[in-house]
Amino acid sequence: MSFSMSRRQYADMFGPTTGDCIRLADTDLWIEIEHDYTVYGDEVKFGGGKVIRDGMGQHPLATRDEAVDLVLTNAVIVDYTGIYKADIGIKDGNIAAIGKAGNPLLMDGVNIVIGASTEVIAAEGKIVTAGGVDAHIHFICPQQIETALSSGITTMIGGGTGPATGTNATTCTPGEWNIYRMLEAAEAFPMNIGFLGKGNASAKEPIAEQVRAGAIGLKLHEDWGTTAAAIDACLRVADEYDVQVAIHTDTLNEGGFVEHTLKAINGRVIHTYHTEGAGGGHAPDIMKVASFPNILPSSTNPTRPYTKNTLDEHLDMLMVCHHLDPSVPEDIAFADSRIRKETIAAEDILHDIGAFSMISSDSQAMGRVGEVILRTWQTADKMKKQFGRLPEETGRGDNVRVKRYVAKYTINPAITHGIAEYVGSVEVGKFADLVVWHPAFFGVKPELVIKGGMIAYSVMGDPNASIPTPQPALYRPMFASYGAAIAKTSITFLSKAAFERGIPDKLGLHKIVKPVGNIRSLTKNDMVFNNAMLQIDVDPQTYEVKVDGRLITCEPAEVVAMAQRYFLF
């Protein structure tokens, strides 16, 4: 017997469906659901008098062999692969299936079997994204990890050894001993982690030994001397071992200008950190490197988006992070050369047109580790407010823009650092790192952060209350953040050379260990929704930025979305 209900009633019960639109937080961004993989009339829902009961939505005979370990029901998935509604089945810590969950004895189209061994997360009315990948981490303090996790970041790539002066300025874990100790420290955290070694040496062996020790990539930083010889040696090692190189170029142009750096790179793939220049790099025209096919460009979140306070904040920030002395005129000039309103304004637009491919934090070293996702969506909203819908949009929503921006902190950094086989998207076979959001809090405060198929962080009320919701509701670590569960639900990434040398056994690592790879053949064309290669020029006198001969600029925002109304308490 059929039953008719209004869209409003349906959305309230099972969540929105195909053609429905959802507003993201308090922004002007809307998503339109492109497809619904659940089956009308056979939807699953947990609760008293609901569907997921023995012999109904739950298969009465299915053992663990047939059933999934966890199912997220009626989720709206926001991913580079699409914006759609589906159930998500998780088994052995991986995404086993996406589609229709339930009992195939009674229901049509079931590809996710719910049984007695299945846990349920009710995701109707919620948005699910892949866990974020922050590929610009200074590992200055371990408390960064819980801050990042509670914001929806589940993978951190960078370098450091704690609050050492070198780490405060550069993302390097230098040398075998330091790499080993940091790999051991990573065992304690419910976070996927990969470390970058120091790439600043003009000979290969001091660099190569760090890759063999476990570094998944190398960092070239001007504070260690990013000379042409160091760039070439580092990239030769990277080509040999199939790892990525991240570069922070020479702000002062002491060793050469941007053209000399490009000549030293010589067409080899490289990840350019804070390509906008405010975080460092050839002044004033580092951003022109984003024109080239071998450059995978990212920028960091303090300049995201450009607001009326951005310039004032950056000067003091820069002085501290790079160990500069405000009483030394040359140090002041160094700082001033980086902070340019014209290039920061252009950065907004270069992200919006897909010329800049990634956004990361630069944690505690001119960046906020818990605001990568927040500032990504603030940038997207500012661009829509100032320039309207993208011309590529076809439906009622902002789906193209949303896919472009979600890719900046999920799939693209995963591709760049050779880990997209494991993380970075909501796809079958990938590690089940998922973030559940209420639409009103999307991008600001997640409800649940799932690591490897188990809840690692959540908003949780008073533990002494009779129900989970009474105040104070705070972010608290959940069971995947404790004990041996950490090792089963989080990944340590290593170079293939270290993996094959048996470094995990040598150090007694218990976390899941995965090798990185498929890096050295990458080009900007591999940056999903963010592969625009345009001619970018910066006027050396006025700092004005032109793209294909056209001036690009925008006004600073006076007010941003996703801000004070969410952070009163």
Curated annotation (Swiss-Prot):
Record text on cofactor binding: Binds 2 nickel ions per subunit.
GO biological process: urea catabolic process
A Pfam family hit: Urease_alpha
PROSITE patterns the UniProt entry points to: UREASE_1 (PS01120), UREASE_2 (PS00145), UREASE_3 (PS51368)
GO molecular function: nickel cation binding; urease activity
Cellular component GO terms held in the UniProt record: cytoplasm
Compartment list: Cytoplasm
Name of the top EC class for this enzyme: hydrolase
Domain of life: Bacteria
Membrane spanning stretches: none
Catalytic activity: urea + 2 H2O + H(+) = hydrogencarbonate + 2 NH4(+)
Keywords, ordered alphabetically: Cytoplasm, Hydrolase, Metal-binding, Nickel
Post-translational modifications reported in the UniProt record: Carboxylation allows a single lysine to coordinate two nickel ions.
Residues that bear N6-carboxylysine: K219
Chain sites annotated for binding substrate: H221
Binding residue positions for Ni(2+) 1: H136, H138, K219, D362
Positions bound to Ni(2+) 2: K219, H248, H274
Subunit structure: Heterotrimer of UreA (gamma), UreB (beta) and UreC (alpha) subunits. Three heterotrimers associate to form the active enzyme.
Family in the record: Belongs to the metallo-dependent hydrolases superfamily. Urease alpha subunit family.
Entry protein name: Urease subunit alpha
Organism annotation: Geobacillus kaustophilus (strain HTA426)
